[in-house]
């Protein structure tokens, strides 16, 4: 299937964190991307990804992401992303916490040369944190941003 790309990787790190030099880690990740061309120079692409972090002195932690982007033509792209991660570095005394985030956004591209485009985009995100972390994070925070993107060579 030429529209499908698969990736698997594994790494063994000796002392990757300066604050915890005595801890080694193994990491594993896998992802799949499926992209389909659409009429009028458009496309649709979806990615699913998973990661595992296995510290030598702590529990194994997982991360998941699902994202999709839809470009009905060469000027617009609409996207959505959902992610969930487990981490012991979020402030609750070293326990593993699960946090999540959902983002929606759009980009409008302006073609300034044959192979150069500048895009202006915006996104809105909502985060989910466990109850014990809500005082530190101000509840389940949300946020928005506007950004510029430069793409050359396409």
What are these regions (language model features)?
Residues 1-93, 102:
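Detector for outer-membrane/organellar transmembrane beta-barrel domains
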Residues 8-9, 48-50, 118-127:
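Extended hydrophobic secondary-structure segments that form protein cores and membrane-embedded regions
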Residues 23-25, 97, 135-141:
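Flexible, surface-exposed loop regions and adjacent strand-edge segments
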Residues 90, 115-120, 149-154:
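Flexible, glycine-rich linker and terminal segments associated
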Residues 90-96, 107-109:
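Short, glycine/charged-rich beta-strand-loop motifs at protein surfaces that mediate ligand recognition
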Residues 104, 138-154:
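Outer-membrane beta-barrel "beta-signal"
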Residues 105-123:
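C-terminal closing repeat unit and adjoining cap/tail of repeat-based domains
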Residues 128-135:
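Low-complexity, intrinsically disordered Gly/Pro/Thr-rich segments
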């Amino acid at each position: 299937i030429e529209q499908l790309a698969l990736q698997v990787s594994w790494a063994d790190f000796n002392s990757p964190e300066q604050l915890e030099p005595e801890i080694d880690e193994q990491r594993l990740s896998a992802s799949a991307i499926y992209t389909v061309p659409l009429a009028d120079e458009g496309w649709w692409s979806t990615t699913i990804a998973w990661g595992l972090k296995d510290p030598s002195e702590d529990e194994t932690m997982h991360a998941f992401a699902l994202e999709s982007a839809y470009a009905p033509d060469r000027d617009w792209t609409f996207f959505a992303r959902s992610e969930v991660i487990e981490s012991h570095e979020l402030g609750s005394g070293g326990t593993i916490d699960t946090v999540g985030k959902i983002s929606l956004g759009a980009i409008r591209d302006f073609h300034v040369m044959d192979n150069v485009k500048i895009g202006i985009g915006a996104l809105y995100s909502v985060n989910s944190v466990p109850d014990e972390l809500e005082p530190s994070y101000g509840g389940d925070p949300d946020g928005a941003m506007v950004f510029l993107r430069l793409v050359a060579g396409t």
